[in-house]
């Protein structure tokens, strides 16, 4: 039996330990995938969910268990683009259990690091799928294509991968040039719009 202990957003743990679909959250997951297929990116989807006052995954977990590290009482319905992006990447929505995505560097250090794909184990069809295979694959293709060139005609090394730690918005490449040197940096997309 797969050993993942915590269900992802969209699922609950059943009495036998298997994941069962959470109808309320599964509806939101399907909506996120539909919005992505319609051409919306994580930032726009997050904004739409926030405007609809849909509780975030952290808020839902807090309401069920009374504890979570991802619950912000002042913003119970404020979705981040980072949360949406993670939902769009999760293979668990295909009905698969994914184990060993991260590992601890040392027993002395609490932080985890992402494992390479060859160390990740996927157990297929362990629970009911929320998203069908064709939809999931199409979303992955669309997400890869969204990494578009910047105004200098280059696709940044971190394009589509960096998100603001404060608000969850996408980070954009900014270039500063002087006669002597060129400096690239990344700034928050929300900050740029102010």
Task: Please report, for each region that a protein language model flagged, where it lies by residue.
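Conserved catalytic breakage-reunion loop centered on the nucleophilic residue
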Residues: 1-194
């Amino acid at each position: 039996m797969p050993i993942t202990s915590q269900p992802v957003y969209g699922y609950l743990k059943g009495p036998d330990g298997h994941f069962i679909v959470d109808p309320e959250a599964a509806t939101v997951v399907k909506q996120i995938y539909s919005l992505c297929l319609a051409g919306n990116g994580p930032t726009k989807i997050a904004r739409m969910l926030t405007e609809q006052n849909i509780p975030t995954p952290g808020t839902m977990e807090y309401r069920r268990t009374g504890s979570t590290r991802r619950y912000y009482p002042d913003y119970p319905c404020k979705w981040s683009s980072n949360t949406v992006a993670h939902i769009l990447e999760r293979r668990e929505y295909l009905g698969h259990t994914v184990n060993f995505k991260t590992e601890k560097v040392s027993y002395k250090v609490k932080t985890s690091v992402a494992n390479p794909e060859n160390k990740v184990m996927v157990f297929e069809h362990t629970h009911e799928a929320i998203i069908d295979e064709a939809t999931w694959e199409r979303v992955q293709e669309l997400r890869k294509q969204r990494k578009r060139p910047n105004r200098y005609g280059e696709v940044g090394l971190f394009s589509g991968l960096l998100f603001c730690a404060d608000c969850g918005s996408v980070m954009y490449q900014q270039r500063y040039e002087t006669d002597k040197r060129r400096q690239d940096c990344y700034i928050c997309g929300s900050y740029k719009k102010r």
